[in-house]
Amino acid sequence: MALPIIIDCDPGHDDAIALVLSLASPELEVKAITSSAGNQTPEKTLRNVLRMLTLLKRPDIPVAGGAVKPLMRELIIADNVHGESGLDGPALPEPSFAPQSGTAVELMAKTLRESSQPVTIVSTGPQTNVALLLNSHPELHTKIARIVIMGGAMGLGNWTPAAEFNIYVDPEAAEIVFQSGIPVVMAGLDVTHKAQIHAADIERFRAIGNPISTIVAELLDFFMEYHKDEKWGFVGAPLHDPCTIAWLLKPEIFTTVERWVGVETQGKYTQGMTVVDYYFLTGNKPNATVMVDVDRQGFVDLLAERLQYYA
């Protein structure tokens, strides 16, 4: 039986590729997709969800737009990474269908209520929508199997020296998610910076030769440019968000540890930092499964295999 999931995302090149991967995987049943503000403004990320689902011929999936700003802060976006549209690079279709009239939280709550089994929430942007869901619907917590997030880092940040972008945008929301008592799986920079796509991998995807693999290659062509900056020391481009979906499909290609994680919401230098109690110093019980390593080749092979689904 396929695993029911809700995807909350802010497309974003890597979010878009996570959508492609999830919808090429019969093991997963994508019951709803909600958009968050982050990589671009809320209007643009919602439009990008609709454009991707139009491309993938999946207008049957309910879509709703989410919070327009973080819980307690002004919105910051990553247009320097993802371009003016949020998905610069390939020519994507205009949306062929409209989102639902309700909010992301309403769609998530309805989906959870109507599901006969607990649903996994995959969140690849800031945690605002998920935190709002948890706070406004405590009665639905038991309907959530787990929350798989792309966010955080045990080590270095990518937006500040201490903080990863998704968590930095809305640290209060992320703290609500981590302390919710619901199992959390964290794909942070420790693993996503190892899930790099190299130039040869992009050509491998392009050579698959179907319309979707071609678009994915073009998304990666654009995404690669930002990551060529020497300061990162990357060979390729880290494919952050697809790690969440890949973990659901093939957990064996990832190495994980069970640890307590908290989010710094006050720090002068460390706002948005995910504090991972790696050495069990706090006495707090683990609240997260933290990804720390990935078999890069296995990750690339999984993407290549699933891109053939669209032939």
Swiss-Prot record:
Pfam families, sorted: IU_nuc_hydro
Lipid biosynthesis as UniProt keyword: no
Gene Ontology MF terms: purine nucleosidase activity; uridine nucleosidase activity
EC number: 3.2.-.-
Any one of the GO BP annotations: purine nucleoside catabolic process
PANTHER family: INOSINE-URIDINE PREFERRING NUCLEOSIDE HYDROLASE, URIDINE NUCLEOSIDASE
Name used for this protein in its record: Pyrimidine-specific ribonucleoside hydrolase RihA
Organism: Salmonella dublin (strain CT_02021853)
Gene name of the encoded protein: rihA
